[in-house]
Amino acid sequence: MDELLRIATSWGLRLDQRQIEQFARYSAELRAWNMRVNLTSITDEREIVTRHFLDSLRCALSWGDTPSRLIDIGSGAGFPGLPLKILHPELHVTLVESVGKKAAFLQHIVAVLDLRDVTVVTARAEVVGRDPQHREQYDVVTARAVAELATLVEYGLPLCRIGGRFLAPKGSAIDDEVVRARIAIARLGGQVIGVEPVEIPGVELRTLVVIVKVAPTPAAYPRAVGIPAKRPIL
């Protein structure tokens, strides 16, 4: 975990010994579970640090004031939500994962790492986005899922409070995708405030799309399960 500590420190992020130990245990549990549940194609220990942990922690440089409530959509193996929880133990984090086996891993790793104030919701994002307990309740919404930005914002912006931020880690060739999503972002109450480079040694250039919520999301969104992916707002 030396590289994790070194790069996080260079970004101005502080990790103590307990947090480093939590990341080490996270890596070990991820690799063990991945032998029976398809959680990630990345199994090399160093790549877990660079492509999962550091890529997740980079979000903390772009969320403005430290949030109190964060929701991670399509959390999978917990990225970026759980590394951000480890970084800021005071965060209240909700992880949304519709696949039962992945949600079971999330419940397991939350217990193993003794993380408090973490809720795992086994449901589709479209359903969660219409639930008054979650709708427009979060300071930060994250989504690292492999989907078009126009689809991701329909999952995420309904959950974001006005003034909050939606953070979408993406690959390098993102300009056209941002342009295609401009109508969806505006209709859902968002405004792009940055497309930031994410530079991690040994990893191809990635980007982080930063969207601020400037207006309420209309009641018609998100649409029914499956529709945002099949027919994005374009």
From Swiss-Prot:
Predominant localisation class: cytoplasm
GO molecular function: rRNA (guanine-N7-)-methyltransferase activity
NCBIfam families attached to this UniProt entry: rsmG_gidB
Family membership noted in the UniProt record: Belongs to the methyltransferase superfamily. RNA methyltransferase RsmG family.
Function: Specifically methylates the N7 position of a guanine in 16S rRNA.
Xref: Pfam families: GidB (PF02527)
Annotated keywords: Cytoplasm, Methyltransferase, rRNA processing, S-adenosyl-L-methionine, Transferase
A single Gene Ontology CC term: cytosol
Compartments reported by the entry: Cytoplasm
Class of enzymatic activity (EC top level): transferase
The protein's name: Ribosomal RNA small subunit methyltransferase G
InterPro entries in UniProt: rRNA_ssu_MeTfrase_G (IPR003682), SAM-dependent_MTases_sf (IPR029063)
Alphabetized SUPFAM superfamilies for the sequence: S-adenosyl-L-methionine-dependent methyltransferases
UniProt EC number: 2.1.1.-
Binding positions (S-adenosyl-L-methionine): 74, 79, 125-126, 144
